[in-house]
Amino acid sequence: MNKQSWLLNLSLLKTHPAFRAVFLARFISIVSLGLLGVAVPVQIQMMTHSTWQVGLSVTLTGGAMFVGLMVGGVLADRYERKKVILLARGTCGIGFIGLCLNALLPEPSLLAIYLLGLWDGFFASLGVTALLAATPALVGRENLMQAGAITMLTVRLGSVISPMIGGLLLATGGVAWNYGLAAAGTFITLLPLLSLPALPPPPQPREHPLKSLLAGFRFLLASPLVGGIALLGGLLTMASAVRVLYPALADNWQMSAAQIGFLYAAIPLGAAIGALTSGKLAHSVRPGLLMLLSTLGAFLAISLFGLMPMWILGVVCLALFGWLSAVSSLLQYTMLQTQTPEAMLGRINGLWTAQNVTGDAIGAALLGGLGAMMTPVASASASGFGLLIIGVLLLLVLVELRRFRQTPPQVTASDS
């Protein structure tokens, strides 16, 4: 009898050509967006010498992403999903070309950067929602956990590589190179995506887009299972906003500039380990309970993080948070895809991703407010323990999620 390994199985990339194409396109896209993420704040800072102006660009892009996720969810449930993905990627690339041309001007326009940031934020998130909605059809619902873990690794790897490349390009060629290569990378992603099969949405009655979006909201609120998953995801994202306290906590621990980097690397490293060791997660009989417990553990790790007497112990707490949050996120992703009707996948994925974006912004704002009234240590601990208390209450209240059981997929020779 074959025994399921703890390690992530990458065989999905070999057996499912469509998922392999998405994997390749996603990795190139993450690297391209990383080049953009380095260039935009640097260019605005050089032009204005104002951190407020840099923050404004991030806020505007985030707002456009939120709207794009909402619109993308409706479009993904009404139109052929492959066309939505290709349209979003191509249109996003046009925005990158605009940023490149603007950077080459003798006096680049700040307004153009803001407007193109809105453009790219909207269309980038539009494609994300359609791709999420199409994933079950590409890999089969029984392989969603494996696909989610591979995707998480892709995101983490790309997020590490792209800032390094972006920094080197800034040092050697300036921001125009970053924008130009980001545009080239985005158009290159169209090549593997063109090989995807047609991804039509399920047949459903035509209705006004706002009414369609409201139907998604109603489903989310009416379903204790799916609604509970989305709520946990938002709270977990709020906890990850603890990174806004890193500089202040680094002063408290008397860390050097080089050591501060370990704080920023700890959560992604823990999450990567969580994805790599997720081989048995799909075989959990009670994924809802495991999701709740891993989320509680993540909140506890954040609660203890700021209380550590040495920075290295704080890094361990952050890595533990990254690992537990990866476990919870993979379970959230898989259960959301399997428990949502096919006709609702676009809207529910859009709402789930949007609440993750919103949760991060709310968490950062709350921690900033606490930081004005408390010490950094007290702020980190108070936020963590507050979320832990809410998590315990949800463990008691979300009865359907806690008691949810599933039949584990059969282990085959190729899975072991």
From Swiss-Prot:
<feature type="transmembrane region" description="Helical">
    <location>
        <begin position="179"/>
        <end position="199"/>
    </location>
</feature>
<feature type="topological domain" description="Cytoplasmic">
    <location>
        <begin position="200"/>
        <end position="218"/>
    </location>
</feature>
<dbReference type="GO" id="GO:0005886">
    <property type="term" value="C:plasma membrane"/>
</dbReference>
<feature type="transmembrane region" description="Helical">
    <location>
        <begin position="84"/>
        <end position="104"/>
    </location>
</feature>
<dbReference type="InterPro" id="IPR020846">
    <property type="entry name" value="MFS_dom"/>
</dbReference>
<dbReference type="GO" id="GO:0042931">
    <property type="term" value="F:enterobactin transmembrane transporter activity"/>
</dbReference>
<feature type="transmembrane region" description="Helical">
    <location>
        <begin position="257"/>
        <end position="277"/>
    </location>
</feature>
<feature type="transmembrane region" description="Helical">
    <location>
        <begin position="110"/>
        <end position="130"/>
    </location>
</feature>
<feature type="topological domain" description="Periplasmic">
    <location>
        <begin position="43"/>
        <end position="55"/>
    </location>
</feature>
<feature type="topological domain" description="Periplasmic">
    <location>
        <begin position="105"/>
        <end position="109"/>
    </location>
</feature>
<feature type="transmembrane region" description="Helical">
    <location>
        <begin position="288"/>
        <end position="307"/>
    </location>
</feature>
<feature type="transmembrane region" description="Helical">
    <location>
        <begin position="219"/>
        <end position="239"/>
    </location>
</feature>
<keyword id="KW-0472">Membrane</keyword>
<feature type="transmembrane region" description="Helical">
    <location>
        <begin position="157"/>
        <end position="177"/>
    </location>
</feature>
<dbReference type="InterPro" id="IPR023722">
    <property type="entry name" value="Enterobactin_exp_EntS"/>
</dbReference>
<feature type="transmembrane region" description="Helical">
    <location>
        <begin position="314"/>
        <end position="336"/>
    </location>
</feature>
<feature type="topological domain" description="Periplasmic">
    <location>
        <begin position="308"/>
        <end position="313"/>
    </location>
</feature>
<comment type="function">
    <text>Component of an export pathway for enterobactin.</text>
</comment>
<protein>
    <recommendedName>
        <fullName>Enterobactin exporter EntS</fullName>
    </recommendedName>
</protein>
<dbReference type="InterPro" id="IPR036259">
    <property type="entry name" value="MFS_trans_sf"/>
</dbReference>
<keyword id="KW-0812">Transmembrane</keyword>
<feature type="topological domain" description="Cytoplasmic">
    <location>
        <begin position="131"/>
        <end position="156"/>
    </location>
</feature>
<feature type="topological domain" description="Periplasmic">
    <location>
        <begin position="240"/>
        <end position="256"/>
    </location>
</feature>
<feature type="transmembrane region" description="Helical">
    <location>
        <begin position="22"/>
        <end position="42"/>
    </location>
</feature>
<feature type="topological domain" description="Cytoplasmic">
    <location>
        <begin position="1"/>
        <end position="21"/>
    </location>
</feature>
<dbReference type="Pfam" id="PF05977">
    <property type="entry name" value="MFS_3"/>
</dbReference>
<feature type="topological domain" description="Cytoplasmic">
    <location>
        <begin position="278"/>
        <end position="287"/>
    </location>
</feature>
<keyword id="KW-1003">Cell membrane</keyword>
<feature type="topological domain" description="Cytoplasmic">
    <location>
        <begin position="77"/>
        <end position="83"/>
    </location>
</feature>
<keyword id="KW-1133">Transmembrane helix</keyword>
<keyword id="KW-0997">Cell inner membrane</keyword>
<feature type="transmembrane region" description="Helical">
    <location>
        <begin position="379"/>
        <end position="399"/>
    </location>
</feature>
<keyword id="KW-0813">Transport</keyword>
<feature type="transmembrane region" description="Helical">
    <location>
        <begin position="56"/>
        <end position="76"/>
    </location>
</feature>
<feature type="topological domain" description="Periplasmic">
    <location>
        <position position="378"/>
    </location>
</feature>
<feature type="topological domain" description="Periplasmic">
    <location>
        <position position="178"/>
    </location>
</feature>
<feature type="topological domain" description="Cytoplasmic">
    <location>
        <begin position="337"/>
        <end position="356"/>
    </location>
</feature>
<dbReference type="InterPro" id="IPR010290">
    <property type="entry name" value="TM_effector"/>
</dbReference>
<feature type="transmembrane region" description="Helical">
    <location>
        <begin position="357"/>
        <end position="377"/>
    </location>
</feature>
<feature type="topological domain" description="Cytoplasmic">
    <location>
        <begin position="400"/>
        <end position="416"/>
    </location>
</feature>
<comment type="similarity">
    <text>Belongs to the major facilitator superfamily. EntS (TC 2.A.1.38) family.</text>
</comment>
